[in-house]
Amino acid sequence: MKPSLLCRPLSCFLMLLPWPLATLTSTTLWQCPPGEEPDLNPGQGTLCRPCPPGTFSAAWGSSPCQPHARCSLQRRLEAQVGTATQDTLCGDCWPGWFGPWGVPRVPCQPCSWAPLGIHGCDEWGRRARRGVEVAAGASSGGETRQPGNGTRAGGPEETAAQYAVIAIVPVFCLMGLLGILVCNLLKRKGYHCTAHKEVGPGPGGGGSGINPAYRTEDVNEDTIGVLVRLITEKKENAAALEELLKEYHSKQLVQTSHRPVSKLPPAPPNVPHICPHRHHLHTVQGLASLSGPCCSRCSQKKWPEVLLSPEAVAATTSAPSFLPNPTRVPKAGAKAGRQGEITILSVGRFRVARIPEQRTGSMVSEVKTITEAGPSAGDLPDSPQPGLPAEQQALLGSGGSHTKWLKPPAENKTEENRYVVRLSESNLVI
């Protein structure tokens, strides 16, 4: 029994002896050098592995690698980029921030909070920059740095500039609204308000820049010119007159397409010069004198060409004569004038007529014409120049004869002629 009892403690001692040796051996194998950390998967045959990017291990040990310090969180610049064996070293504060000198672990504060005399905040005028650019250096692992964002405190100069902008913008807005209001008021009174200079047509490609409808009245302006100018001063009347002229032009094109156009033969030297246009009346009584290379109406350029009515053109081409025939039957479908009126010009619904003076006698006065220094009515040729308007045929009579309007011999008073302008159903008597 005794030998067995002695063997038991000995055997236990021999069994427990290898455990401390084994423990020491395993403990020394798990110590990793700087820049490495223990491998948690020892099945690959390695006990330590390198530190991942963005981490470091500065001494021997079994602890895992630690991440690098982030200087952006402390509002500091990176003085030295971290490696696998060394942490990132932070330097001075960002521009516009202040902090304890030589203590890189303490976060920096904005200069707007700093008292007077703090180093680094005097040159910035105690203002912090918005969106400060960070000197972000790419680390060995390629970690990106995010710039910080700070608050901004305005100084006296910046505040004054903001107040100036706030005061100027409403002033310009009010000036624009005032200009629009004044322009609308002028338009209601009949003025022409434009934002640019109007260039009128001229022989040299330029003009005076004034609308012809708004020019001052000329002393030598004829009666029809005054009437047309007064009518075209209103936009509604001008638009209606344009429609009438378009309708008249369309009728003229239809009529001239079915008959040949007769040309004006050269006139003899003793005949007075006639306007080459031959498409409008210069005065109520007939053709007017010339002023320069063209007629007075064309030189003034205050209205488009006023053409003869379709009835007058048809009467001229069908039966040309020197004197108007008062007994001629009006054309079917044409608008007849009122009793006692003599039509001077008719364009669509626009009609200019002459009203003789109505005497108190029982009979209406008649307009008589006589021919002076010329052949008798029986000797007049039938059609000396076919295709000419009536007023030009009266001027181009043979032998220099001319007609004259006479009053009845019973009356010695001056006859007053009144003219009426009819547009649709409304009349304007002058």
From Swiss-Prot:
Residues 27-162 are extracellular. Coiled coil: none annotated. GO terms for biological process: amelogenesis; apoptotic process. Disulfide bonds join C51-C65, C71-C90. Keywords: Apoptosis, Cell membrane, Cytoplasm, Disulfide bond, Glycoprotein, Membrane, Phosphoprotein, Receptor, Signal, Transmembrane, Transmembrane helix. Residues 1-26 form the signal peptide. Residues 184-430 are cytoplasmic. A motif (RFRV motif) lies at residues 349-352. It is a single-pass type I membrane protein. One of its GO terms (cellular component) is plasma membrane. SMART domains: TNFR. Residues 134-143 have a biased composition (Low complexity). Glycans are attached at N149. Residues 134-156, 373-411 are annotated as: Disordered. The chain crosses the membrane at residues 163-183. Its main location: membrane. The keyword Transcription regulation does not apply. TNFR-Cys repeats lie at residues 50-90. The modification Phosphothreonine is found at T223. Belongs to the RELT family. May play a role in apoptosis. Induces activation of MAPK14/p38 and MAPK8/JNK MAPK cascades, when overexpressed. Involved in dental enamel formation. Interacts with RELL1, RELL2, OXSR1, PLSCR1 and STK39. This is Tumor necrosis factor receptor superfamily member 19L. The gene is RELT.
